């Protein structure tokens, strides 16, 4: 009998993960892997004994089996499998939807190797988040749920005697490996990519051998080296997701706010999209949910100055807890405060004429850093001074009223009377400002200094304003294959129209992740690939935020499929929607991609390029666009080239699989027995379109898969099993776990998605997913939005 107080074999998957998180160990993998890892850690804690030995570890079935009959073991195993399946069923069903989407989506057909490669990349992208422990990441849950069902469920179904014989030998091998890794806290950014053979051997040692044989091509958890899995590959994976759902409804327009334009405040136009500004425009924070925790967010004040001696105050109100991001090597909280020109970017201190003082006690300008002043923290107040009355413009700071001296000196000739604007850059922090609106400042200021709000209006300079109406806003969608020259065109066009466009592309997202000091930390620890994987995920949510803003945008992505074009442009209803097609000659395209591969390395596998060629569709004015521009080949020539590409794709790739039309699958259970009884027939996890009481023994348990036409919560809102009526919960009532409201019925449309009912399940905030439309906007209308805690941020279309 093990001396450990934790009996590992009796823990569910969620409990195993919780125990592993307490010990700062990785919680990814199949249930067998989690059990081995936890048991090894427990053995080490108990005194460094071997991780798994027959008769000594709590996982050994031999001692327990002696006191129970075989039938009892089978019943316990079946009950455990059902409980685990209930926990993970939604994730598994979501995983099935992913597979169907891959088959039916814009990617077309692919051979078995290509499909495995996609699944492995999707797993790498979202499962091993390398330090980014994201509870809301639906793709990570898919991998865990599907993996646990496929692996652990097979183990549970083994006869007790066979299980007892197999486990000791399995545990010894896996336990030694786990023991070696659990000697200290493990950074989850560290990822080991094992060769396919070794990885398969590990899975078989974990009890997943039968599943691999039965599953055929569905090999989950197999990781492969990714020589050609760079930025382009993750963009390609993200782009395919647009083929899986119906076109979204246009977002609800923002309410027109009547705000006194003479007041100095944070400017809602001159800020990042993910910079959350309060309604009074005097406080703000960066978004922190999901992958946004990696991004820096900044904004400027509405007015700047070019004369006198002026100041403003900034208080760090909170370092927002980022519970889904754990790392001991990366600074996850930071604030920079200072001044910049209106032509400068939002990354304070990363350009010329952009001056910032950091929470770490560092001053930064044009990516050059130097120690300055003191470090500051929560509840500290930083006063920023700009003195234009000396021979050189002097920028200085004070911490809690204590002068820190001059930080920057700027030549007036170089500055050329251009105004400087208050500017802040946040990384998982919340701040508030005093531009002079307070009757009494946080700390006294020199008598000869004036708050910027108190400077006469004629001596202040208003920052640039955005379009007044949505009809005046412009969105330009780039369309073209990877490496065709889209970004080159965007860079040139933006330079010809300075300050007009917000560019939404992977490059811009990466820039907001890799601020100079942070970039160096990531490079030193070898974690840049984490950002590379997260950037395309953020970009999709950026586009949804952008559709609510009155600005001009350029979408710098491939957008080759008709589905991606349609679904993105549907969000921008009311905008001037334009398309720019970059389609060079085939010879030119080959030269460009070869040159790019020589400089940046190959980042997209050949089969992915072939799929994109096969799905390349030229846009039409009548559909989603008001205007279409062809940069190189014109429409007729481009159409001929695309026909050539489609033939090339068709010959190189296997025949396209038959698409799922959405009809019900035939019931494989021909017995016709009670399908809502656990004991026989189909368990009724999903797929039934229940319109009335056509079932036995009262209403079935609320297992989360029946189409109730929106009348009741789905997951856990009402429990019950067997003949218990649906109003009676099986256990603790958690309406709206956050999965699809129709989670499991074969007709997956028609109802709002992800997070429809309960907004606070398990403390994950107000909306697990980001596609719920009605709930989020109601929340905004009810005035609850700014009452939320910052760490409860979960993006949805009405969020912001």
From Swiss-Prot:
State the compartments where it is located: Nucleus; Nucleus matrix; Chromosome; Nucleus speckle
Region called Disordered, residue ranges: 41-257, 647-729, 745-774
Effect of deleting the gene: Mice exhibit early embryonic lethality between 9.5 and 11.5 dpc. Mice show retarded development of embryonic ectoderm at 6.5 dpc and growth retardation beginning at 7.5 dpc.
Q: Which residues carry this modification: Phosphotyrosine?
A: 242
The record's Pfam families line, in alphabetical order, gives: AAA_33, SAP, SPRY
Annotated segments matching region Actin-binding = 587-602
Report domain B30.2/SPRY positions.
244-440
Where in this protein does the record say Asymmetric dimethylarginine is found? 691, 696, 703, 709, 715, 730, 737
Q: Which InterPro entries match?
A: B30.2/SPRY, B30.2/SPRY_sf, ConA-like_dom_sf, P-loop_NTPase, SAP_dom, SAP_dom_sf, SPRY_dom, SPRY_hnRNP_U
Compositionally biased, Acidic residues: which spans?
Answer: 114-128, 134-147
User: Could you say which residues bind ATP here?
Assistant: 480-487
Looking at the record, which segments are called ATPase domain?
464-648
Which regions form coiled coils?
626-653
Note on domains (UniProt): The SAP domain is necessary for specific binding to nuclear scaffold/matrix attachment region (S/MAR) elements in DNA. The RNA-binding RGG-box region is necessary for its association with inactive X chromosome (Xi) regions and to chromatin-associated RNAs (caRNAs). Both the DNA-binding domain SAP and the RNA-binding RGG-box region are necessary for the localization of Xist RNA on the Xi. The ATPase and RNA-binding RGG-box regions are necessary for oligomerization.
The protein's role, per its UniProt record? DNA- and RNA-binding protein involved in several cellular processes such as nuclear chromatin organization, telomere-length regulation, transcription, mRNA alternative splicing and stability, Xist-mediated transcriptional silencing and mitotic cell progression. Plays a role in the regulation of interphase large-scale gene-rich chromatin organization through chromatin-associated RNAs (caRNAs) in a transcription-dependent manner, and thereby maintains genomic stability.
- Full protein name: Heterogeneous nuclear ribonucleoprotein U
Identify the species of origin.
Mus musculus (Mouse)
Q: Which gene encodes it?
A: Hnrnpu
């Amino acid at each position: 009998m093990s001396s450990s107080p934790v009996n590992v074999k009796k823990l569910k998957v969620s409990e195993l993960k919780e125990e592993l998180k307490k010990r700062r160990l990785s919680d990814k993998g199949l249930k067998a892997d989690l059990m081995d890892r936890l048991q090894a850690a427990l053995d080490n804690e108990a005194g460094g004994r071997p991780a798994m030995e027959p008769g000594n570890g709590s996982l050994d079935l031999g001692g327990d089996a002696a006191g129970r009959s075989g039938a009892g073991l089978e019943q316990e195993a079946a009950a455990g499998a059902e409980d685990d399946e209930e926990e993970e069923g939604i994730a598994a069903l979501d995983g099935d939807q992913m597979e169907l989407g891959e088959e039916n989506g814009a990617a077309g057909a692919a051979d078995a190797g290509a499909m495995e490669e996609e699944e492995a990349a999707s797993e790498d992208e979202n499962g091993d988040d390398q330090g980014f422990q994201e509870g809301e990441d639906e793709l990570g849950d898919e991998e865990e749920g599907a993996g646990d069902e496929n692996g652990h469920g097979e183990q549970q179904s083994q006869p007790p005697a066979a299980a007892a014989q197999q486990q000791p030998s399995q545990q010894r091998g896996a336990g030694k490996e786990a023991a070696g890794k659990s000697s200290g806290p493990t950074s989850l950014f560290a990822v080991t990519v094992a060769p396919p053979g070794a990885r398969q051997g590990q899975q078989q040692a974990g009890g997943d051998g039968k599943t691999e044989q039965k599953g055929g091509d569905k090999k989950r958890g197999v990781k492969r080296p990714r020589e050609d899995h760079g930025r382009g590959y993750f963009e390609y994976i993200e782009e395919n997701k647009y083929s899986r759902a119906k076109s979204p409804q246009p977002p609800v327009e923002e309410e027109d706010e009547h705000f006194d334009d003479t007041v100095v405040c944070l400017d809602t136009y001159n800020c990042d999209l993910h910079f959350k500004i309060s309604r009074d425009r005097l406080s703000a924070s960066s978004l922190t949910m999901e992958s946004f925790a990696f991004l820096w967010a900044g904004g400027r004040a509405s007015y700047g100055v070019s004369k006198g001696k002026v100041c403003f105050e900034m208080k760090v109100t909170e370092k927002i807890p980022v519970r889904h991001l754990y790392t001991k090597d990366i600074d996850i909280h930071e604030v920079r405060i200072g001044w910049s020109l209106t032509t400068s970017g939002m990354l304070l201190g990363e350009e010329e004429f952009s001056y910032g003082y950091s929470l770490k006690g560092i001053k930064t300008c044009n990516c050059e850093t130097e120690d300055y002043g003191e470090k500051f923290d929560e509840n500290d107040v930083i006063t920023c001074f700009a003195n234009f009355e000396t021979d050189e413009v002097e920028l200085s700071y004070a911490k809690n009223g204590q002068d820190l001296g001059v930080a920057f000196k700027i030549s007036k000739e170089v500055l050329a009377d251009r105004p400087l604007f208050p500017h802040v850059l946040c990384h998982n922090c919340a701040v508030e400002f005093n531009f002079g609106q307070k009757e009494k400042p946080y700390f006294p200021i020199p008598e000869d200094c004036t708050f910027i709000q108190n400077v006469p209006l004629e001596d202040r300079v208003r920052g640039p304003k955005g379009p007044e109406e949505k009809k005046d806003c412009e969105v330009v969608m780039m369309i073209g294959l990877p490496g065709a020259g889209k970004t080159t065109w965007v860079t040139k066009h933006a330079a010809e129209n300075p300050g007009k466009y917000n560019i939404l592309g992977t490059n811009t997202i990466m820039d907001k992740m890799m601020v100079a000091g942070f970039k160096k930390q990531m490079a030193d620890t070898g974690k840049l690939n984490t950002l590379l994987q997260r950037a395309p995920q953020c970009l999709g949510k950026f586009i949804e935020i952008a559709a609510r803003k009155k600005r001009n945008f350029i979408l710098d992505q491939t957008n080759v499929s008709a589905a991606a074009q349609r679904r993105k442009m549907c969000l921008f209803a009311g905008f001037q929607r334009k398309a720019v097609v970059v389609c060079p000659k085939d010879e030119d395209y080959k030269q460009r991609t070869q040159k790019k591969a020589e400089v940046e390395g190959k980042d997209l596998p050949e089969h992915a390029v072939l799929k994109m060629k096969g799905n390349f569709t030229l846009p039409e004015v009548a559909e989603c666009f008001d205007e279409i521009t062809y940069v190189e080949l014109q429409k007729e020539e481009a159409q001929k080239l695309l026909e050539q590409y489609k033939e090339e794709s068709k010959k190189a790739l296997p025949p396209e699989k038959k698409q799922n039309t959405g009809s019900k699958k035939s019931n494989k259970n021909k017995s016709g027995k009670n399908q809502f009884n656990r004991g026989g027939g189909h368990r009724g996890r999903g797929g039934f379109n229940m319109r009335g009481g056509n079932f036995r023994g009262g209403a079935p348990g609320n297992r989360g898969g029946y189409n109730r036409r929106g009348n009741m919560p789905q997951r856990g809102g009402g429990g019950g099993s067997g003949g218990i009526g649906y109003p009676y919960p099986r256990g603790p009532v958690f309406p709206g776990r956050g999965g699809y409201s129709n989670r499991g019925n074969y007709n997956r449309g028609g109802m709002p998605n992800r997070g429809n009912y309960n907004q606070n399940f398990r403390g994950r905030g107000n909306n697990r997913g980001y596609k719920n439309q009605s709930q989020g906007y109601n929340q905004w209308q009810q005035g609850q939005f700014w009452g939320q805690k910052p760490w409860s941020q979960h993006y949805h279309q009405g969020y912001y």
